[in-house]
Amino acid sequence: MAQANSRSRNSATISYPEKRRARVNLGKREVEILKTPYLLETQIESYRKFLQKDIAAEKREDNGLHAAFKSVFPITSYSGYAVLEYVGYSLGGESTLFDVEECKLRGLTYAAPLKVNMRLVIYDKEAPAGKKAIKDIKEQEVYMGEIPLMTETGSLVINGTERVVVSQLHRSPGVFFEHDKGKTHSSGKLLYSARVIPYRGSWLDFEFDPKDCLFVRIDRRRKLPATVILRALGYDTEQILDMFYKTNHFHLNQETVTLDLIPQRLRGELAVVEIKDKKGKVIVEANRRISARHIRLIEKAEINKLELPDDYLYGKVIGKTIIDKETGEIIAHANEEITAELLKNLRATKTASLDTLYINEIECGPYVSDTLRLDTTTNQLEALVEIYRIMRPGEPPTKEAAESLFENLFFSPERYSLSAVGRMKFNRRVGRKELTGLDVLSKEDIVDVLRVLVDIRDGKGDVDDIDHLGNRRIRSVGEMAENQFRVGLVRVERAVKDRLSLADVENLMPQDLVNAKPVSAAIKEFFGSSQLSQFMDQNNPLSEITHKRRVSALGPGGLTRERAGFEVRDVHVTHYGRVCPIETPEGPNIGLINSLAVFARANEYGFLETPYRKVVDRVVTDETEYLSAIEEGDYYIAQANTNVDEKGRLVDDLISCRYKGEFTLTTPDKINYMDVSPRQIVSVAAALIPFLEHDDANRALMGSNMQRQAVPTIRPETPLVGTGMERTVAVDSGVTVIAKRSGVIDSVDASRIVVRVDRKETEDDDDIGVDIYNLTKFTRSNQNTCINQHPIVEVGDKVQKGDVLADGPSTDIGELALGQNLLVAFMPWNGYNFEDSILISERLVEEDRFTTIHIQEFTCVARDTKLGPEEITSDIPNVGESALAKLDESGIVHIGAEVNAGDILVGKVTPKGETQLTPEEKLLRAIFGEKASDVKDTSLRVTPGITGTVIDVRIFTREGIKKDERTLEIEKAELSKVEKDLNDELRVREDALFENLEKLLTGRVAAGGPNKLAKGTKITKSYLADLPRQKWFEIRLQDDAATKRLEASHEHFKELRETRDAKLKDSRQKLTQGGDLAPGVIKIVKVYLAVKRRIQPGDKMAGRHGNKGVISTIVPIEDMPYLEDGTPVDIVLNPLGVPSRMNIGQVLETHLGWAAKGLGKKIGEMIEKGADAKELRKSLKPIYDLSKTQRFDLEALEDPEIVTLAKNLRKGVPISSPVFDGATEEEIKQLLKMADLPTSGQAALYDGRTGKKFDRSVTVGYMYMLKLNHLVDDKMHARSTGSYSLVTQQPLGGKAQFGGQRFGEMEVWALEAYGAAYTLQEMLTVKSDDVAGRTRMYKNIVDGDHRMDAGMPESFNVLVKEIRSLAIDIGLEND
């Protein structure tokens, strides 16, 4: 990945773009400890783990495809005599047939074939019992469909469109304890429940009912007493009671009972008798409640026996079954209540002692004991049958069926898996030390869950918070693709099992057993139509990055919009540093779709973690550690802006920190960690908003979302006031071209850059590396915006690995540039900025500041129809010459033609159905072969409302069909482009080769050679210069070593030429081979139109602080308010938009922007006066010295570089004010002072129309404004006549259908109220659904007769038909 390590260079070297234009950083914090991580890491890393493409088969880890295969294979036949084993897999032997760009053009999926090595083992049936003898082993590679590959930028190309698979935030597998918040029962009693959620398999729920009995549900079915599942696990009543209760031991006397006393257990009870110590002193009086003080006294007196009356035992529960030792009969069952009669029986059978359950309202409730009484089952089999009846109602249970069903529910690895995450979470929650174990449940697991649940009901322990990020995990692309793949494999498994059981399995090969269709169908379905596989948002680089970093709680296995409550959507304390609290959509999805914070990443288990700096003994170290939400709770974590001295010691006595999810103050010695950066808590989009800390959260949310909708302008301009994130975003998004290796620029033109790579970067000494970068020119993005790259380097420039060589859309010298810096004034202007309207100057239109290019794609498909093939041709029936003027002889529009709505782009005719011909016509056709009458014109035309220039045409023809002139022409042009690249590469390499040869040959003694080179003469440079290069190899030298090197060079020379020819041949074959088109398609023509959209009233604009508005009018430059020096402002905003919305950041940005522009102006004046590099260096130093930290090193630049830098700063000195660490009021004032501007940030303005000064000074400055992708051109729509609905005959609605305006019920009332009868009649008849009337009307207008006679509206006929359908005969009576 070129981008992945683009920023791994040491910070000492200044990158090429930074030398051209560096930002003044006003952040207060010292140098960033942790560089911003590669922003697309989540996607790329996840998919890399899934494919494990470049890892040898035996070294692959247990995840992704490998894990899916291992979990399904080996597949054994029902008899057990044949086994299909999985050995390994490989992805795409050669490189994929088409690269990403070609796949996009041809509408293909960018994928690699998956070949799996399988082994079929057949065992001998005749072998003696108990021994397995192998009869035959066959190994074979089986093709299992195509697996989509990820592009370098983390997207996938599916059917020619770029898509992104959004990560999902779902509930982690494991066990969760919760209560119903008192909503279930009218009393408001809290009912506790436990739920075991597996990664796949049945859910297991335990719950209390209002009577405190425990119940179990499997897969949310009908509930059963919880003890049924314990019995099904093989426990009997006594064991169950033993697991949940302690017992009290009683000795039976003739009249009384003696209790073996454990004093603690008396707490809270009423004393039935007086309790005395050995001396007879009363400790507790009768009928008093026993308190903790009493218990201490009892323990002190060492009383361990207590004689109690019989009635103390009544109502207590027997803990162990009591058996008559003589007869062996059962006197009392476990869990039976003691009555007077039972005691009498016990004494009669001479039972000496008994155990009762220790049940106490305070710490040990009778829940399990009560549940056992509800449980009708008595043994394991009955319990299994009961469970079977719930899961399979209506089926007769058998012992085997019941046992296998229960076994498969929770204990079979095929049907149930907790996964490593689930097991870790489960063990942690039930308090076990080891964090690994089986993926299925065990008896102990189920018992432990019940134990914890009972403890929580008894008040020991807390319920879980399901919105805690320790209980929600991220599922990324790789994991979701793996799950889909497994689903496909399981479908294959069933088919393979059946085939393995066939008699002739010995003659089959693995290929015959495996059908790859279900697997590729599952993968295709996932990438093509899953809710989480989305059409990539490609408005601008930021929207791409944000889309790839998005985290959604929706999707399969997630929440639904309707069911998600307030808690799930809310910001949670654990979001800190993991998920952005600001960036989320407005509307129904708010809070369900989030964005990863800048530094967040998912750990091995899929939980989000965020980095912190370690603090040891009050000293902040440079060591960083990633903590997940679970680990974070136990530490004191200080904020990033905590005061620290030079040695890194914490200075303050009390430090604001976070502990257990609360914000608190504590002493410095308790602090364990500290935030890495102030922008740690926000996402990429929010981190691009300067002065975010001064904006209200709601507006910041809008600001983050609107930056993603900015359309790339023709001339991007980086913001004067940024945050320092701009470069990172531009580089990581992959829209710029980045140097793969260091080197020198060899040649540059608008569409490609050739770099001669530095020697140290090439693997081979002889080989001189050449990197050729082809730039993307005017390509259409998913949102129809324009992707265009242009170089920023010049020939001879030295570039380092990772430097930006060419800017893409919305980037300016390697920095993100979504909009334009405009001179803004906050003031009202004749009501034109009422309610967020925006007033702009005509200058913005003149200078094309917000002109954008949109590229529309039109596709024309010629198919084989039943009546014959459609034909693409310029011979179209009933079309005038003028309409065909822009087409070539093949019927396809010329490149460069300017077309308007309704113009033909591709001429196409379709055969018409045979019409009944008269005998005369038949004769004529037989004689002349006249065919024109039976085709109809189905040409591709430009849709209404679009005018533009044709910039590209692509033609795809089916194999075996003759290509037309135009296709051959396009192929020829493409080929010459490839040839030029290969020739350039060859030229650079050959130049280097001959350069080395010249060094080798010059001054050597020759042994003969061409051009009469005598033996023994020295070779000179002039001799070599006159000799054609090819002939250098004919020179013979006396030195053997040198001769060998010359021969080696000759070989290398030949090799270079051969490689070039082979590559050219390969490209030619790729270009000329026919397209793989859908069945029935003969030819596809794609025409690309570039539409230039200037800014105009009705377009939506916005700043970065959520300050959005619509342009109300464009005012001539001379009428705009102007400053004292005559500069007219560019844009006028309403000052009332600031106070109520509380986004003050825009005002601070305006002031700082003005200062930045003012400094730039001063530098510009110096350059105009002819200042040299020394003077410029002197004046730039104080500006760059404003940076407290991360200071830009001017000394590292050479003089010419200083001059270039100063020239680039004329438009304004770019400043970065990082989020939550921005410029202070004092700094802004200081900068304004340096720029010789008023420190109030306000200036006197003059009215452009009258020349008079306005009464008050106005806040003026530079603000960064964006043009959003809500353009009035896309919304404007007008219709004369068009398509009508079939049933009602009324015009369709909406722009896409070329529909009309709805004239609804209320509009009718309005006309009725005015008594406008004729207008109303016209609206409801001829303008709508009076079919005959509207045809007559059209005819009348054409004849110049403007009368109207309305007939019967079609909707009346529909009404008549509907009434008739109710069997009521209704009809119109004609007088």
UniProtKB/Swiss-Prot annotation:
EC number: 2.7.7.6
Record's GO cellular component terms: DNA-directed RNA polymerase complex
Enzyme class: transferase
Keyword Isomerase: no
Protein's UniProt keywords contain tRNA processing: no
Keywords tagged on the record: DNA-directed RNA polymerase, Nucleotidyltransferase, Transcription, Transferase
Family that this chain belongs to: Belongs to the RNA polymerase beta chain family.
Annotated protein name in UniProt: DNA-directed RNA polymerase subunit beta
Organism this protein belongs to: Coxiella burnetii (strain RSA 493 / Nine Mile phase I)
Gene that produces this protein: rpoB
